[in-house]
Amino acid sequence: MARAFLFVLDSFGIGNAPDAEAFGDLGADTLGHIAEFCAAGAADRAGLREGPLHLPNMSALGLMHAARLATGRLPAGMALPERVYGIYGAASEVSRGKDTPSGHWEIAGTPVTFDWGYFPAEGDAFPPELVEAICREGDVPGILGNCHASGTDIIARHGEEHMRSGKPICYTSSDSVFQIAAHEQTFGLERLLNLCEVVRRLVDDYNIGRVIARPFVGSDPGSFTRTGNRRDYSVLPPEPTVLDRLQEAGRTVHAIGKIGDIFAHQGVTRLTKANGNMALFDASLEAIEEAEDGALVFTNFVDFDMLYGHRRDVSGYAAALEAFDARLPDLDRRLKPGDMVILTADHGCDPTWRGTDHTRERVPVLMFGPTLRSRSFGIADSFAHIGETVARHLGIGVGPHGRSLI
């Protein structure tokens, strides 16, 4: 029996999606613009990285071919490898948002065909009656922020007042999200998580996709740092995903990183938390060593999005891609006959783009394993085909929204 390993490089888009203009993202290209900056020397950073973007392993799996499919051109400074060792292509999203749950649920075979609720960008983000209910039921003296913001910026702006007053920092973005930042010592991590559970219940009436706990430490704006104790409180997917179908078939689903939170822990058999891309990679390798026949190992590599995409850090994003790429031989050595690895993404977050939000992009789909022969599948018209490829590979029924790419 086969095994499948699904790795989501969070926000690693490869060129604007066909409907990008409707999202204000026409021209966005996470990979292309990172490569362009690297080729021009604009992503050099002392002690971190320098020179053209160097992704030899993903290139050998078809990444540059996929990028050319998505955009019609090669990323700057990049060349096609002499040989490709995997099945490759690009995929466009059909879900109506460019957020994390929409992307992941669609990858798992369940597109989001409804509209999420969003909070306004002008004025106070949250309705007065919601703020009042949060203060009353969450037992807090008020809130700070109440706006669209970058997480690191708003913590720097309000962190000291939060520590003095005990008021949590509440903010949102262009995603369907309610984020709460609080100090782990002065406010307390457990209290923050309890507050998020209260808010999760309260924002259900507003059709908000996620409530996110954003704990931080430090004593002043210069030392405030978000910790690895982030927690996402998502609603349930609108219908069963490939995770549910695997679980019903008696298979093991290993959820690593924030995968469990994204799926509200539905369809998850084993949960592993880790902080940082390299720790997530290590945890994935450990799960692969343990995974039995028929199992799925599903990992989200969040640093690309959280640390570099939203913060518009081109050098950091490039270095993170290069570090991930360098680990792929460690993965390849652990594969057995019948194993399949899929590298993909859930949306874009172009670090050269205006603002701090996600970008509507096509994503790469790179599939490899000891028994897979190299070819292109072209451009898939839904991320759902990724999940159904997993379903077919693992020998369970294909769902209603996609088809296998192999």
Swiss-Prot record:
Broad enzyme group: isomerase
GO cellular component: cytosol
UniProt-annotated binding residues for Mn(2+) 1: D10, D346, H347
Pfam families the record matches: Metalloenzyme
Cofactor detail note: Binds 2 manganese ions.
The keyword Metal-binding is assigned to this record: yes
Catalyzed reaction equations: 2-deoxy-alpha-D-ribose 1-phosphate = 2-deoxy-D-ribose 5-phosphate; alpha-D-ribose 1-phosphate = D-ribose 5-phosphate
EC numbers: 5.4.2.7
Pathway(s) of this molecule: Carbohydrate degradation; 2-deoxy-D-ribose 1-phosphate degradation; D-glyceraldehyde 3-phosphate and acetaldehyde from 2-deoxy-alpha-D-ribose 1-phosphate: step 1/2
Amino-acid positions noted as binding Mn(2+) 2 in the UniProt annotation, renumbered to this chain: D305, H310, H358
Subcellular location: Cytoplasm
Signal peptide: none
MF term (GO), any: manganese ion binding
Major location category of this protein: cytoplasm
Cofactors required: Mn(2+)
Keywords: Cytoplasm, Isomerase, Manganese, Metal-binding
Keyword Manganese (UniProt): yes
Biological process terms in GO annotation: 2-deoxyribose 1-phosphate catabolic process; 5-phosphoribose 1-diphosphate biosynthetic process; metabolic compound salvage; nucleotide metabolic process
Alphabetized PANTHER family for the sequence: PHOSPHOPENTOMUTASE
Family: Belongs to the phosphopentomutase family.
Function: Isomerase that catalyzes the conversion of deoxy-ribose 1-phosphate (dRib-1-P) and ribose 1-phosphate (Rib-1-P) to deoxy-ribose 5-phosphate (dRib-5-P) and ribose 5-phosphate (Rib-5-P), respectively.
Name of the featured protein: Phosphopentomutase
Species the sequence originates in: Rhizobium meliloti (strain 1021) (Ensifer meliloti)
